[in-house]
Amino acid sequence: MSSGGLLLLLGLLTLWAELIPVSGQDHPKKPGLCPPRPQKPPCVRECKNDWSCPGEQKCCRYGCIFECRDPIFVK
């Protein structure tokens, strides 16, 4: 391929790359900004199982956090 053909191909690819994001915008952006990312506590493993918790508490998992919590009872 000649250098002129290569430059033409490169130019067309650049133009195509610029047009894709514009055509993908079906709706305008909503007003306002996103709030800061909520801060999550670090992964803490307070317990390994129900028996490692005091009294009637259970070892409850919330994502990567394991903590002793009072149980709830559902009828």
From Swiss-Prot:
The keyword Repeat does not apply. GO terms for biological process: antibacterial humoral response; innate immune response; venom-mediated disruption of cell wall in another organism. It comes from the Eukaryota. One of its GO terms (molecular function) is serine-type endopeptidase inhibitor activity. Its main location: secreted. Keywords: Antibiotic, Antimicrobial, Disulfide bond, Secreted, Signal. It is found in: Secreted. Residues 27-72 form the WAP domain. InterPro entries: Elafin-like_sf (IPR036645), WAP_dom (IPR008197), WAP_four-disulfide_core (IPR050514). Disulfide bonds join C34-C60, C43-C64, C47-C59, C53-C68. GO terms for cellular component: extracellular region; extracellular space. Residues 1-24 form the signal peptide. Expressed by the venom gland. SMART domains: WAP (SM00217). Belongs to the venom waprin family. Damages membranes of susceptible bacteria. Has no hemolytic activity. Not toxic to mice. Does not inhibit the proteinases elastase and cathepsin G. This is Stewaprin-a. It comes from Hoplocephalus stephensii.
